[in-house]
């Protein structure tokens, strides 16, 4: 798509003569305690502390493996690059004062909610850490842990420390996503007055900063834990723990990351969609005013929600995905290396860390490939922003194929099976292709350039009911291709792994599960660039809101509308990517759970027979959990939206001058209502997700004790996990795609199709968009986290079920 001259070269004229309805709400910027402490330190003291920390990290890495040193080096370089991207973005101008005022209010709202939300989450995390400590002090140990002298107390402290570190890193990942978004949005708005390309580049680099930090922290956090435990426990020395058993000590890290990600996604999703739905129902439908109009009392809450829901929550979500995938792959790699009696198993265990280190390198190249702004005096059309992002993604994919092949040859070559590395390289290629197909499928079903969304828009012309029917049917249909893709990927990767030539002492092939692990790594090998595209969406959305509220020329709004439409598509495609990776990661975690049960029970645990009534009931409970969780998440958005609607209606009735710009809306009141409701509503579905597998496992463990079935608790939980994963994948695909399609059908009509804004088709499309909001931004993304968190909970609690 090409943009016209008047879109590319927007007017810079001042609009100060237009009426405004916006108060200056700026207050002191919030930052977490750890950052405030660092700021107060003397520069020399801080430098010495950093040098000491880096020295300690590299010492532990050198004492562990040269591979860990490579991982540490890449992560630190990526952090330095992210600092460069931050400075580059913050060096851009913020535009006129009216833009800055709006941006400041959004920043205040986002940081205020973040502070309250994460304070609540941290208290719950500390309480859960205490529960885990008590449970682990009375749990059983694996024979290998007992032989290595690892007592219950030591095991408990290690798991709790890993849990708290995972929770902390996940929280920081969320904060980083929000921090950059609330500072980049106004700079994108300002750049849109000059050039669409400049606005695009700022949004991409801001998203890139967050992505590199999130992925880098996931990798370096696990690497630090691994090397610390390796040195501390004397792994590899006579009488100590075997290196192949070490990854089991890391499961707490994945659980901590999942715990924070779930509540971040729930709270952020309820906030953003409660505000969005409430603002749309009264503003667009009842009052007939445009989106992001300054007369709407809920508009600031809506814009704040983009940051806490789409940026902070998505950062924590992908952090958790990567952490869970790395840990499960390390467990499976260690198990396979032990079965095959590979002389140096470190390559198979540390392979996931190296893959994601290369991810940081190639994604950085992809981000920097989005070239700078042309001279503003050059009046020529530019490429479609989606095409620009797609070129960067294609470059990243090509580099991923090359680096993945090099990584497999470097780390997975073994004399026992000289060609095994090539089979695993093909497994990685399967994962990379799967990721690309998932992105394409999501784009096809949610981009208004393609038939499905246009058909949905056409259905809007005959009323609200036909819009809803068409959207639901589109969402249901959209599950078919992804499921077929996942099925082919799992079977292909398993077959390639099984035929790699790696066999156990009985000559039985053992590489199948590790092959699926490698495919999952391949799918996530471009995660940093995918997260960049995801972060681009809410930044562009916020920029459009700032432009609308500051009443900039229509040509500027056209640029931000275009970026916003592309952002909607990238958000939808990255959600497809996220659920695909969650599906493969959950399969890995399920396999890792079975390996862990085998290790603790000291008996083979390879099959789950659903013909056993209790096991079948566990599966039913898992499927039910997905539906009940989704219902509670959507209902939470509905209740929050009702509070917002009542407040906005009250303000319009009591302050009739708002519509004529004679009175200012009370924006802060809506922000407070949404924040309070989101924090209140996130507890119930979150508690359901955490308590369900633990309660089910304990109940059936007791039942198994009295019926002479010692592994019944573990089997029922395995069945619950299996069914919940299958139902969760399908439900998330339906919710994400239907919601994204409804949103872009509305955007398509707003471009002028089928009567444009204000038409009957547009009103029906707004209804569909309203229904789709909690689907795609609350329930759907939360299910991504839920199915992985169920797996990490079972990994941590597996000894309790025996």
UniProtKB/Swiss-Prot annotation:
Keywords: Golgi apparatus, Hydrogen ion transport, Ion transport, Magnesium, Membrane, Metal-binding, Translocase, Transmembrane, Transmembrane helix, Transport. It is a multi-pass membrane protein. Substrate binds at residues 273, 776. Coiled coil: none annotated. The record marks 310, 317, 777, 788 as: Important for proton transport. GO terms for cellular component: endosome; Golgi apparatus; Golgi cis cisterna; Golgi membrane; trans-Golgi network; vacuole. It is an enzyme of class 7 (translocase). One of its GO terms (molecular function) is diphosphate hydrolysis-driven proton transmembrane transporter activity. Pyrophosphatase active in both inorganic pyrophosphate hydrolysis and H(+) translocation. Activated by Mg(+) but not by K(+). Inhibited by Ca(2+). This is Pyrophosphate-energized membrane proton pump 2. It comes from the Eukaryota. Mg(2+) 4 binds at residues 568, 743.
């Amino acid at each position: 798509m090409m943009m016209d001259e008047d879109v590319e070269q927007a007017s810079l004229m001042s609009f100060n003569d237009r009426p405004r309805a916006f108060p200056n709400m700026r207050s002191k910027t919030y930052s977490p305690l750890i950052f405030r402490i660092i700021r107060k330190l003397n520069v020399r003291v801080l430098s010495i502390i950093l040098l000491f920390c880096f020295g300690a990290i590299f010492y532990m890495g050198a004492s562990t493996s040269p591979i860990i040193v490579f991982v540490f080096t890449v992560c630190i370089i990526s952090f330095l690059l992210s600092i460069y991207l931050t400075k580059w973005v913050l060096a851009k101008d913020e535009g006129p004062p009216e833009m800055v005022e709006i941006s400041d209010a959004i920043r205040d709202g986002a940081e205020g909610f973040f502070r309250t939300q994460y304070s609540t989450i941290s208290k719950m995390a500390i309480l859960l850490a205490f529960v885990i400590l008590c449970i682990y002090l009375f749990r059983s140990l694996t024979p290998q842990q007992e032989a290595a002298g690892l007592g219950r107390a030591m095991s408990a402290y290690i798991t709790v420390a890993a849990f708290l570190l995972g929770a902390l890193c996940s929280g920081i990942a969320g904060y980083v996503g929000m921090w950059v978004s609330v500072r980049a949005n106004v700079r994108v708005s300002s750049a849109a007055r000059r050039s669409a390309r400049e606005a695009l580049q700022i949004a991409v680099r801001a998203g890139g900063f967050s992505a590199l930090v999130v992925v880098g922290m996931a990798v370096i956090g696990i690497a630090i834990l691994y090397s610390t435990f390796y040195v501390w426990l004397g792994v590899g020395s006579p009488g100590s723990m075997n290196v192949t058993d070490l990854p089991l000590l890391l499961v707490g890290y994945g659980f901590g990351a999942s715990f924070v990600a779930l509540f971040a996604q729930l709270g952020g999703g309820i906030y953003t969609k409660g505000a969005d739905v409430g603002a749309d129902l009264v503003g667009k439908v009842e009052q007939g005013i445009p989106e992001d109009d300054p007369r709407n009392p809920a508009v600031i809450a809506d814009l704040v929600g983009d940051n806490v829901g789409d940026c902070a929550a998505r950062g924590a979500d992908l952090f958790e995905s990567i952490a869970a995938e790395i840990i499960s792959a390390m467990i499976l790699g260690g198990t396979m290396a032990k079965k095959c009696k590979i002389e140096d198993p470190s390559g198979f265990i540390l392979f996931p860390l190296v893959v994601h280190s290369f991810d940081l390198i190639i994604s950085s190249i992809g981000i920097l490939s989005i070239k700078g702004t042309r001279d503003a005096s050059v009046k020529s059309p530019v490429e479609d922003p989606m095409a620009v992002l797609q070129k960067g993604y294609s470059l990243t994919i090509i580099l991923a194929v090359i680096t993945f092949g090099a990584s497999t040859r470097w780390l997975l070559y073994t004399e026992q099976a000289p060609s095994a590395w090539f089979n695993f390289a093909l497994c990685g290629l399967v994962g990379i292709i799967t990721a690309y197909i998932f992105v394409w499928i999501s784009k096809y079903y949610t981009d208004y350039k393609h038939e499905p969304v246009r058909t949905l828009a056409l259905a809007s012309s005959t009323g609200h009911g036909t819009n809803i029917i068409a959207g639901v049917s589109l969402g249901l249909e959209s599950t078919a291709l992804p499921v077929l893709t996942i099925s082919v990927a799992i079977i292909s990767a398993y077959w390639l792994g099984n035929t790699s030539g790696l066999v156990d002492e009985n000559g039985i092939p053992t590489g199948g599960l590790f092959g699926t692990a490698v495919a999952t790594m391949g799918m996530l090998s471009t995660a940093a660039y995918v997260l960049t595209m995801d972060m681009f969406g809410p930044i562009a959305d916020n920029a459009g809101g700032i432009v609308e509220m500051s009443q900039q020329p229509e040509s500027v709004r056209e640029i931000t509308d275009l970026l916003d439409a592309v952002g909607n598509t990238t958000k939808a495609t990255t959600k497809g990517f996220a659920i695909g990776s969650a599906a493969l990661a959950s399969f890995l975690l399920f396999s890792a759970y079975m390996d862990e049960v085998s290790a603790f029970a000291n008996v083979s645990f390879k099959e789950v027979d659903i013909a056993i009534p209790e096991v079948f009931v566990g599966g039913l409970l898992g499927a039910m959990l997905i539906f009940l969780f989704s219902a509670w998440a959507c209902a939470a958005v509905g209740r929050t939206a009702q509070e917002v609607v009542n407040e906005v209606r009250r303000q319009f009735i009591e302050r009739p001058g708002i519509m004529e710009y004679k009175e200012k809306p009370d924006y802060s009141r809506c922000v407070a209502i949404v924040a309070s409701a989101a924090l209140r509503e996130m507890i119930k579905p979150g508690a359901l997700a955490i308590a369900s597998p633990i309660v089910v496992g304990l109940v059936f463990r007791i039942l198994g004790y009295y019926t002479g079935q010692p592994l019944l608790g573990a089997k029922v939980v395995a069945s619950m996990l299996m069914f919940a994963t299958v139902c969760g994948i399908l439900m998330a695909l339906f919710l994400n795609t239907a919601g994204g399609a409804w949103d872009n059908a509305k955007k398509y009509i707003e471009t002028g199709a089928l009567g444009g804004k204000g038409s009957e088709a547009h009103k029906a499309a707004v209804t569909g968009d309203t229904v789709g909001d909690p689907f795609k931004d609350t329930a759907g993304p939360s299910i991504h986290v839920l199915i992985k968190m169920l797996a990490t909970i079972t990994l941590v609690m597996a000894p309790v079920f025996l």
